[in-house]
Design a protein with these regions (language model features):
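Short Gly/Pro-enriched turn/cap motifs at secondary-structure boundaries
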Residues: 7, 18-19, 52-58, 104-108, ...
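Glycine-rich beta-strand-centered segment in the early N-terminal region that forms part
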Residues: 18-34, 47-87, 127-130
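Short N-terminal binding/cap micro-motifs at the start of the first secondary-structure element
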Residues: 10-14, 38-39
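NAD(P)H dinucleotide-binding glycine-rich loop of Rossmann-like/cofactor-binding domains
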Residues: 83-147
């Protein structure tokens, strides 16, 4: 697949990389829209040691499920992948899961690529009346929301 790869401070390349292999409980998403976050810019400038090169950045994304029972569904992605088993996850506070991961930070590649894999529980369906360009903005809009 094609991906935009962070190669080091102020260096990116558009190149062919290996297709992602979905783990159990993960699905393959064909990325159709992705935002550029301030954290992507910090990484690009070399100001984020949590994002070492080479790495595919991008975590504000929307696309289409391209396999399994939900093949063809339009979705946006919650980029925070939690364990789903700890007390924080059990009380709806996945943001403080001690084992949390975020796409675009190792060990998870990001969405500046044709495809990304993500747990099915991290997907939110996008109604057909909303564009996937708008759906890619759900993550930054949801940053300040918690029930």
């Amino acid at each position: 697949m094609k991906a935009l790869v962070y190669d080091g401070p102020k260096a990116i390349s558009h190149r062919e990389v290996s297709d992602p292999n979905p783990r159990q409980d993960h699905v393959l998403i064909m990325i159709k829209a992705v935002g550029i976050c301030g954290s992507d810019m910090h990484a690009y400038l070399g100001h984020d040691e949590r994002r070492p090169a080479p790495l595919i950045l991008g975590h504000e994304a929307a696309g289409i499920i391209c396999e399994g029972a939900r093949d063809g569904e339009r979705v946006t992605i919650n980029p925070l992948v939690s364990c789903g088993k700890c007390s924080a996850c059990g009380t709806g506070r996945e943001n403080i899961c001690p084992d949390r991961q975020i796409i675009s930070m190792p060990p998870r590649e990001g969405a500046f690529a044709q495809y990304v894999t993500i747990p099915e529980r991290n997907l939110v369906n996008v109604p057909t009346e909303y564009s996937l360009d708008k759906a890619a903005l759900v993550e930054p809009l949801a940053v300040g929301w918690h029930t």
